[in-house]
UniProtKB/Swiss-Prot annotation:
Gene Ontology biological process terms from the UniProt entry: carbohydrate metabolic process
Gene3D superfamilies the UniProt entry points to: 3.40.50.920, 3.40.50.970
HAMAP family xrefs: Phosphoketolase (MF_01403)
Signal peptide coordinates: none
Identification of the protein by name: Probable phosphoketolase 1
Organism: Rhizobium meliloti (strain 1021) (Ensifer meliloti)
Enzyme class: lyase
Its EC number(s): 4.1.2.-
Keywords from the named record: Lyase, Thiamine pyrophosphate
InterPro entries: Phosphoketolase (IPR023962), THDP-binding (IPR029061), Transketo_C/PFOR_II (IPR009014), Xul5P/Fru6P_PKetolase (IPR005593), Xul5P/Fru6P_PKetolase_C (IPR018969), Xul5P/Fru6P_PKetolase_CS (IPR019790), Xul5P/Fru6P_PKetolase_N (IPR018970), Xul5P/Fru6P_PKetolase_ThDP_BS (IPR019789)
One Pfam family recorded for the sequence: XFP
Length: 789
């Protein structure tokens, strides 16, 4: 085993430094070394030793195991093991198991046209790149859920352990059911240093460290030392103990029905940073110090550095590790598992291999009956929740669907799912608790990071899910979204990576209905962030009512390798489309609402476009005012569900061709666009369109407070009155005919201000507005006064 460790260390150093002469079959020269040295050595030897010992128990016990490494900058390590196990050559036949293959393996690392420095999607066996630190445990627990035979060995770097998401990630054990789920074996890689500083967990007494992890609900096992022979013995014993404890816990739960939360084992692995590299270089400490974090020697134009590198690599005795052709010796190769038991070839690390379609009810069965536009009222999110309840019910037996939320499931109106499942919870449960159970499939923890990380781990290992969150607070995982989008982008370019289920976001409690919580809860900017990513990855939907939301939800759950963002409200609101109309509208992604328009057979005077449920409501109210006061005006109403339809077809696969866009929006008529989010996003998406100069967008412009629902749109000039004023200002031909109308609009806004400041609620003429009923009508129930979450 020590020889196998030396082989993986040799390959790790070779990837960082060598361009040629992979077996050091001739004296090392400057031309054998890369001109630019990139990569990270410091964590690699520790990762290598852990991998070798995990292989021992996998082979001995025929285990199904994955390796998730938080310090993903140790890319040379996982690539080395994938190569030594043969997996690398299977998926990349050009990297053969001989001296020439070794040369190519070394050259390609962190080299133009080669592979990245981290455990990116190109690395067989990886589901976690580890470039942005903090999510290793979240991904590991997500992978373990509903995988009862899987053990996820999760290495946590001591630097990563200082991040917020990782600090919360330890609590994943409060949601892991030993009867139903697999196991996560956390391994704290305590090598003492980050890039240029010590790690605080390495500088506190062992007793304090032990108490910390015991307080987290773990039974820590310590492996500590500098001498490899001693550490080999300690690590072997610790793994044997950990696996025995895991088997005991799982047997007790699965055979005896004991679901009391156990103290799962974990390992504290304290070894030197940069282990086995030169102790000093140029008179400065290197091994067991931060200088070994990346490339211990950067200036290879110094002959002395070449001699040091050669001596370092020869210290691993490559002649004992590889035969004359450059192949790993048969004796060492026999130490590794074979086939799918190899961690580099575990199918869970290529989740698309295991992905099975969800059993889906017909979403049309959940339709809201709409006799005429605006006649019915419904809570769109609650209707969606009823549909998801039955998706959950149909897939309980297969155990491949979960919902995730940071304590916002009920607030976002998905409580119907609790009719068929509970909230997963392994801590103490009291009699008065609401739907808590170790067997629950609703994952609620007040951490957007854990919700996102668990879902990613769940998806990456071949399952399905949906993430519900307040719109403003989804920003907390902006960078996690980034990393998953990057992962999917690269996976699309790797033939052996199979497609996985899409990552689906449902954003509710949105900006226009956060009047009760105030300014801190008002931010629609996540969609701006999303559209920065690759067009073949991201999708953004803003359904205007429940039936369109049902159609979009069904589509998202059937899609693969996308990130779908769905934004819709949870408050009672008018319903516009029948189910048949909704399906057609969502299929097209946008279109003219003929029933709201009066320009058929002629050119419109103005186009009124809307995207989002509240902007749609305000647009239709504005159109009705225009019909009443300027009946001769020809108005075309366009609603947008699929935001990416606005981009040209050359920019996004869903984008409308210019000819079709011009036919809808005209080439020269004013366009008043009421948008759910920040208005400049619409300008970004449409700046190349013919009629962009006539496009005027209203949306959220960072005005908000605790106020009434209608005042929110007034503050941002998205209300019906400002929209009407925008039309008048852009149609000079109206002249004096519009003067009195415009004055009446200003007076109505003054009335609004006086009314809310006196009574604390919107005017009945606003809250009671109804399409087709004139300026006032039966209440639609858009108030949020009863909603304090």
């Amino acid at each position: 085993m020590d020889a196998y460790w030396r082989a993986s260390n040799y390959l790790s150093v070779g990837q960082i430094y060598l361009l040629d002469n992979p077996l050091l079959s001739e004296p090392l020269k400057r031309e054998h070394i890369k001109p630019r040295l990139l990569g990270h050595w410091g964590t690699s030897p520790g990762l290598n030793m852990l991998y070798v010992h995990l292989n021992r128990v996998i082979k001995r016990d025929d285990l199904e195991m994955m390796y998730v490494i938080g310090p993903g900058h140790g890319g040379p390590s996982l690539v080395a093991h994938a190569y030594l196990e043969g997996t690398y050559s299977e998926v990349y036949p050009d990297i053969s198991q001989d001296a020439e293959g070794l040369r190519k393996l070394f050259k390609q690392f962190s080299f133009p046209g080669g592979i990245p420095s981290h455990v990116a999607p190109e690395t067989p066996g990886s589901i976690h790149e580890g470039g942005e630190l903090g999510y290793a445990l979240s991904h590991a627990y997500g992978a373990a859920f509903d995988n009862p035979e899987l053990i996820v060995a999760c290495v946590v770097g001591d630097g990563e352990a200082e991040t917020g998401p990782l600090a919360t990630g330890w609590h994943g054990n409060k949601f892991l059911n030993p009867a139903r789920d697999g196991c996560v074996l956390p391994i704290l890689h305590l090598n003492g240093y980050k890039i240029a500083n010590p790690c605080f967990l390495a500088r506190i007494p062992r007793e304090e460290l032990q108490k910390f992890f015991e307080g987290m609900g773990y039974a820590p096992l310590f492996v500590e030392g500098h001498d490899p022979a001693d550490v080999h013995q300690q690590l072997a014993a610790a793994l044997d103990t950990a696996l025995a404890d895991i088997r005991r816990i799982q047997t007790d739960a699965r055979v005896n029905g004991n679901l009391k939360r156990p103290a799962w084992p974990m390992i504290v692995f304290r070894t030197p940073k940069g282990w086995t590299c030169p102790a000093e270089i140029d008179g400065k400490k290197c091994e067991d110090y931060w200088r070994s974090h990346q490339v211990p020697m950067g200036d290879m134009d110094k002959p002395e550095h070449i001699r040091i590198l050669e001596g370092w690599m020869k210290s691993y005795r490559p002649e004992e590790l590889f035969d004359g052709d450059g192949r790993l010796t048969a004796e060492l190769a026999a130490l590794a598992p074979t086939g799918r038991r190899r961690m580099s070839d575990n199918p869970h690390a290529n989740g698309g291999l295991l992905l099975r379609d969800l059993k889906m009810p017909d979403f049309r069965d959940y339709a809201v009956a709409v006799q005429s536009p605006g006649a019915a009222t419904a809570e769109s999110a609650r209707v969606m929740g009823s549909y998801l309840r039955d998706v959950m019910k149909l897939n309980l037996k297969s155990g491949n669907f979960r919902l995730f939320s940071p304590d916002e499931n009920n607030s976002n109106r998905w409580q119907d799912v609790l009719e068929v499942t509970d909230r997963c919870f392994m801590a103490d449960i009291y009699p008065e608790d609401d739907h808590l159970s170790p067997d629950g499939r609703l994952m609620e923890v007040l951490s957007e990071h854990q919700s996102q990380g668990w879902l990613e781990g769940y998806l990456l290992t071949g399952r399905h899910g949906f993430f519900s969150c307040y719109e403003a607070f989804i920003h907390i995982i902006d960078s996690m979204f980034n990393q998953h989008a990057k992962w999917l982008k690269v996976c699309n370019e790797i033939p052996w990576r199979r497609p996985i289920a899409s990552l689906n976001y449902f954003l509710s409690s949105h900006v226009w209905r956060q009047d009760h919580n105030g300014f801190s809860h008002q931010d629609p900017g996540f969609i701006d962030h999303v559209v920065n990513k690759k067009a073949d990855i991201i999708r953004v939907y803003l359904p205007p009512d429940a039936n369109t939301l049902l159609s979009v939800t069904d589509h998202c759950l059937r899609s693969r390798n996308y990130i779908n963002v769905v934004v819709a409200g949870k408050q009672p609101s008018p319903q516009w489309l029948t189910m048949d109309q909704a399906v057609k509208h969502c299929t097209e992604g946008l279109g003219i609402w003929e029933w709201a328009s009066n320009d058929k057979g002629c050119e419109p005077d103005v186009v009124m476009a809307c995207c989002g449920d509240v902007p749609t409501l305000e647009t239709l109210a504005a159109v009705q005012l225009l019909r009443e006061h300027l009946p001769e005006l020809k108005v075309r109403v366009i609603n947008v569900v699929n935001l990416m339809k606005l981009q040209p077809s050359g920019e996004h696969p869903h984008g409308l061709p210019d000819r079709d866009f011009d036919a809808l929006f005209t080439k020269d008529k004013p366009i008043i666009f009421a948008f759910h989010g920040y208005p400049w996003l619409i300008h970004r998406l449409t700046y190349r369109r013919t009629n962009h100069a006539n496009l005027h967008v209203r949306g959220y412009k960072e005005e908000g407070t605790t106020t009434t629902p209608f005042d929110m749109v007034v503050l941002n000039h998205l209300d019906r009155f400002h929209l009407v004023e925008d039309v008048i200002d852009r149609l000079p031909q109206l002249g004096a005919r519009a003067a009195y109308f415009k004055q009446a609009i200003h007076e109505r806004l003054i009335d609004h201000r006086h009314h809310i400041e006196k009574y604390g609620e919107d005017m009945p003429v606003i809250s009671g507005w109804k399409w087709g009923a004139g300026s006032a009508g039966k209440a639609q129930g858009t108030s949020t006064k009863g909603d304090n979450v």
